[in-house]
Amino acid sequence: MYIDSIIIAIEKRLGFLIRGKYWLWKIAFISVFLFVVIDFTGNMSKVVYFRSFINDYIKQGKLDTAHSIIKAQSEDYFEFFKQGNQTGITSNQHEAKMRFRLFLPTLVKILGAKHFEIWLYFLTFILGFFYIHVIAKIAFNILGETTNRILVLFFVAGFTNLYAGGGSFVLDIVPYGDFFAFLFLLLSIYTRNPLLIFVYCQCAFWVDERALVNAILVMIWWIFMPFNGNKVTVKLNTQWLAVFISGVIYMGIRQYLTIRYQLHDDTYMGEFITTFKENVKMLSLRVWAGFDGMWILIVMALTILFKEKNYQFLMAFLGSLITSVGFAFIAYDVNRGISYGFIALLLSLVICKKYLSEKELKYILIVCFLVSILSPTLNKFRLVGGGQLM
């Protein structure tokens, strides 16, 4: 077929680029490069976005709201809690939403607050390449050593084009800090050491509470992950338990701080309901914006599980996805929330690898990548004032 010949020709050229010992790193760099080129040429307003970063932060040393709150938290966590209670900060204020997001303030406290708005961005950017490299390595482990390396490239390139990929560290000047939660969630499925899994999950939870909800996907990974060959089987283990215990401890500490500093706010539920109703008005677009074309891989995986009558895995996987998406809808930045469930993409790759041929999987990954870079979702637009519209 004509399409096959085109794909083979492309494979040969791409294969030349990812030869050698450090080919996984090459895939990481190529994927990030493609993301930057595609994202910036598709929306030149992001050039203005980075120009403001240089003028406001680097040259003038200005701090926006998020930076100011992080700095205040880093100076004294508990004083920040007390001030929040005394000044009557309500749930719709940004300060209230960042009360328990203590990872970035801790990082700033350890490494120093001087020019932190600059070094924090560059630290995130550098670690981003390591993050994509780990994604590539896990994808390679899933696909197997005999698999064509091009499949790894297609998957990683498609993933990097998402907010959960390159967007979280290339564009995060604000800073949201989501990248660190993504990194820790990824490391919690990369290592098999229960203690490290516990620590990584704790770090992710204190970056953003959305990581707690999506830790369900990490537990599903450890319960269903095929350790022996390509078998997808249920396996309860210490890794799963480490994730669960970490979540319980986080909730316990958070509840203690809420009671201790009288931070309970009855307005939260009303705000959540109002936000949910507003987001539902753009249901399809907001859901799609979470994973763009990579949703195709997830839908394919769910279809395969249903066809193979693997209802146990299907219900666990689908239930966790619905929970993740539902929780994302109680905040206005929906696709940020959905992005926290990116482990679903790796789970989907596991399923598709087991039941599809290499050629079929290759075509699916190519389509996922192409649709992701061509679809005009919320990731592609900008709000007045420089904030990401998500």
Language model regions located:
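Aromatic- and kink-enriched transmembrane "portal" helix at the membrane-lumen/periplasm boundary
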Residues: 102, 117, 151-183, 206
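Transmembrane-helix motifs of polytopic, lipid-linked glycan transferases
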Residues: 122-144
